[in-house]
Structures are given as C-alpha cells and as structure tokens.
C-alpha cells in the first residue's frame, strides 16, 4: 500500500492549531435569538401549571414555550441505527419538553429572547406549580415491590430491560455449578467468594459544551447546526420528536470540541428545532451550561456488581456469577444496550470450567440519565471481573499473575453465544511481556510484609474490548465517493471526527 500505513499529518491539524477550524458557535449569524431551558426543581412529579406573567415583562423576551405547547411525540435518544425489529428498537420515552418530571433538572419549558441576559432573567422569573412525588433515587428502591413506575405509559415497572446470558451448559446456574463441584471435589478443596463491587457516575466533561443553533430555510426545511457525534440519527429523531417528515430536517455537524459518548445521544437538537419553528424560523441559539450538562445530558452508568466465584484451592476457576444493576436515571438513552454489553464482556476473558451465569438489570430512577461513555459498559465489566479475580487469587494464596495465566481464555476457544472460534488471542504473550517489563516478581518480593500507613504495591488486570451487537443490529455502514473533474474526490460517510483521526484515516483509504 502506498498511502495506508504512512505517518501523515492529520488533515484537520492545521485548522485546529491555527484556530481557523469552525465549531458550531463560530458559524452563528449576527441576528440570532437566544434560547434558555427551564429545568424542573423537583426530581419526581408532575407540572400542574406555569405563571409566565413576570417573565414575559422582561425586555427582549420573544416567546416562552412550555411542556403544554410542545408536540406530544415520544422519541428515542440513543445513537443507534434504526432496527426493523420492534423488540430491538430504541425506547421512545422522551418528549421535547416534559410535563411528567422524572429527574431534577428535567426540561419543562424554554425561553426565546433577543439576548442571553434577557433569556436567563426571564427563565428565573417563571413560576411553576408541581404535584411532587417521592424521588426514587436508588436501584433497590426502584425495583422494590410496589414501586411507582416512572414511565407507566410504556413500562409496568422501572426495569428498562433484563438481560440474561450463560456460559457452559444451556440454562446453567451458579447453584448448578456448586452442586456439580461438591459432587466432584472435596468440600475442603473448594473456595466460594461473594463480593459486591460498585462503579460511580462520571461526567464526560468535554471542553465544548453542547451547543447548537437552528433556523428554517426558504423552503420550510428546519436546519440544526450542532456539535453532535450522530448527525444522521439526530435528523431521524428530530423529525420524530416534531412529527414532521425526515426530509424536512437537515443536520449540519461542524468541528466538535470533544464528545466521549455524551454527544452520541440526541440532546437538545429537537428542542432547538422546535424553538426556531415557534418563532417563524428565525435563527435560535441554544447552549447548555456546564451545570446543565452534568444534570441534564448524560453520565456514565453507576452499576452495582454482585459477584460470586467458585475456585479450587489449586487455582482452577469452576464457576462465576454476576448480577449487575445499572442506575439509568430518568430516561432510557443507551441504557438497555450498555448494561447488557457489560455482562457480555464479563464472561469473555476467563474459562469457567463448569459455567457462568450473568443477569443484568437496567433500571429507571429519579436521577440524571446515564448514556454512552467511552468503553460502553466495558470499564464496569473489567472492574467487576478483575476485582473478583484478585479476590479469588488472594483467597487461595495464589499469585494473581499465575492465577490469570492458568484461567484466561486460550486460542481455539469457541464462544457458545455466537459459535465464533478464537483463532488469535495473544493474551498470554501480552501478560508475559508485562510481567517482564514491570519486574513483577522482584516488586512482589520487595513490597511484601510492609507496615505503616503508606505502602507500595504492584498489581495487574486484563480486559477485552469487542464490537458488534448482532442480532440486535447488523450495524452496516456505507460510503459514497464522488470523483471530481480535477481528480480530487468527495467522500461522504457516517463516521464522525471527534479527535480520533477518522477524517485522516478515511482520506488515506480513499486515496489508496
């Protein structure tokens, strides 16, 4: 190959370094209006009424729109391609503005004004009457018998989805493994581990805040210029949210100042489109503050992993179990896929000689909505699996490195979930190299038997990352290449440049 594999300068490097690259906010027209979202001040309840009297007196206010003015159209926000199978489609549980409040900071109204100051001042003066309910903050409370459903129109309880998977015999359970082990081994040769591990919520904290601006062109098409990772999906969901044909919506994605998965969700583009349509098509700018981003966009999932492990005293892993409980917050977003992906990856690195049992629950709560974030459930899976692995090794007094070498997957393993054979793995070679380069044995001896409040240690972990969600979605992709008269080429594709170098790599591929 002449171009692919060469060390070339990034195609977007010069523009970003010199400041010539244009982001969403750099492209706004001069006469633009400013939008401000009014968020709920309760975590669970119902909006009864608004008093807009004082807010409408603020000079410069053009319009105030409430949940009672917005289209009654539910739409999904996850950045997934459309599935033709109803059971695999993303969950439609959101409206442009929501009367039913499901989290503190829910979007209930919006102000459009001539300037930011007027919009912010008017938003503070809007008075809201609520019918307030007890917040359901934890997964345990949300799953308790008799818990009030946050989305009674689409769910009879607060469980968004329950995913079950096994390794080994069909319908294997951890209790089956215990029974089989006690028949095969002496009881004193078996060690059972029961632990609970947690992962916290994390905000993406991308430098560029979620920002967009929208207008209606002379042909009646609403155009949204947005810092989004998923322009094609935003187009579909915006049309669905407003109840208009997809052909009446256009999404423009300029340069993006970071996303990390938060912008792999439909955020405020539908609302921005609704605002401009409500003021005769005049351009409306909508920027979300850092505080609003943390409470009102997406976070990483907080997941509780209830784990069990069964191991022999010679270091042979017999069975493992994971019950994962994901706090998804007020809306579904990507949650139905992420927790399932977490459970799916938990089973992939180690050989459970008898089998593994995995159950994952994604649950609505009265808290900020969790969605896509780098790793997509795999960081949580790695934390659960590796903590359990270390605890099993510690329980039998075995070196964690040797324990992993004895139990990790090997070439030739056949995944029972999909029948795929592992022809190349390289994990053991990787661990051997890591052990050598960090001087594992020497440091283990050096750091043994320490005392005092400050101590040094050496540890290790392994993880895998995989892609593809068949049969839920085929995730097909396509590209359109147009050769110009001068020999240059225009390439249209679905991959979004968010700093990972996609534009450069695909330019190389097109050149080749």
PLM regions and their residue ranges:
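Flexible, low-hydrophobicity surface segments
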Residues: 1-161, 188
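Glycine-rich loop/linker segments at domain edges
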Residues: 6, 12-15, 86-87, 158-212, ...
């Amino acid at each position: 190959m002449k171009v692919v594999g060469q060390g070339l300068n990034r195609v977007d490097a010069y523009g970003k370094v010199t400041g010539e690259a244009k982001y969403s906010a750099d492209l706004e027209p001069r006469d633009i209006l400013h939008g401000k979202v009014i968020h709920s001040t309760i975590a669970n309840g119902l909006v009864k009424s608004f008093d807009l009297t004082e807010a409408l007196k603020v000079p410069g206010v053009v319009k105030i729109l409430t949940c009672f003015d917005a289209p009654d159209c539910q739409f999904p926000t996850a950045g997934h391609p459309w599935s033709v199978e109803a059971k695999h489609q993303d969950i439609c549980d959101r409206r442009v503005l929501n009367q039913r409040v499901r989290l503190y900071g829910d979007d209930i109204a919006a102000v459009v004004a001539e300037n930011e100051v007027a919009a912010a001042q008017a938003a503070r003066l809007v008075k809201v009457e609520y019918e307030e309910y007890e917040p359901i903050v934890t997964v345990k409370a949300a799953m308790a018998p008799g818990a009030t459903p946050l989305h009674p129109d689409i769910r009879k309880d607060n469980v968004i989805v329950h995913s079950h998977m096994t390794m080994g015999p069909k319908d294997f359970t951890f209790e089956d493994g215990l029974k089989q082990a006690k028949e095969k081994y002496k009881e004193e040769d078996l060690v059972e581990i029961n632990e609970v591990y947690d992962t916290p919520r994390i905000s993406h904290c991308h430098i560029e805040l979620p920002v967009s601006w929208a207008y209606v062109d002379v042909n009646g098409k609403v155009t949204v210029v947005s810092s989004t990772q998923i322009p094609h999906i935003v187009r579909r969901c915006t049309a669905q949210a407003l109840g208009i044909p997809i052909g009446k919506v256009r999404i423009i994605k300029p340069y993006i100042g970071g996303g990390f998965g938060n912008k792999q969700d439909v955020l405020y583009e539908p609302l921005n489109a609704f605002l401009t349509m409500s003021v005769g098509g005049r351009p409306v700018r909508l920027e979300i503050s850092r505080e609003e981003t943390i409470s009102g966009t997406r976070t990483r999932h907080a997941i509780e992993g209830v784990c069990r492990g069964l191991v022999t005293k010679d270091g042979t892993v017999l069975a493992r179990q994971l019950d994962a409980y994901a706090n998804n917050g007020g809306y579904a977003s990507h949650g139905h896929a992420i927790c399932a992906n977490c459970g799916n990856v938990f089973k992939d690195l180690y050989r459970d000689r008898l089998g593994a049992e995995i159950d994952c629950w994604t649950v609505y709560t009265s808290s900020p909505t969790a969605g896509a974030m780098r790793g997509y459930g795999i960081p949580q899976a790695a934390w659960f699996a590796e903590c359990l692995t270390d605890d099993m090794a510690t329980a039998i007094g075995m070196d964690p490195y040797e324990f992993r070498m004895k139990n990790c997957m090997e070439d030739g393993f056949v995944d029972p979930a999909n029948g795929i054979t592992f022809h190349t793995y390289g994990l053991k070679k990787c661990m051997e190299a890591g052990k050598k380069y960090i001087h594992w044995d020497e440091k283990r001896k050096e750091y043994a038997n320490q005392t005092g409040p400050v101590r040094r240690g050496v540890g290790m972990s392994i993880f895998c990352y995989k892609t593809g969600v068949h049969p839920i979605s085929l995730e097909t992709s396509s590209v359109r290449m147009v050769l110009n008269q001068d020999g240059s080429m225009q390439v249209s594709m679905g991959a979004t440049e968010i700093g990972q170098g996609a534009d450069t790599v695909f330019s190389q591929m097109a050149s080749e």
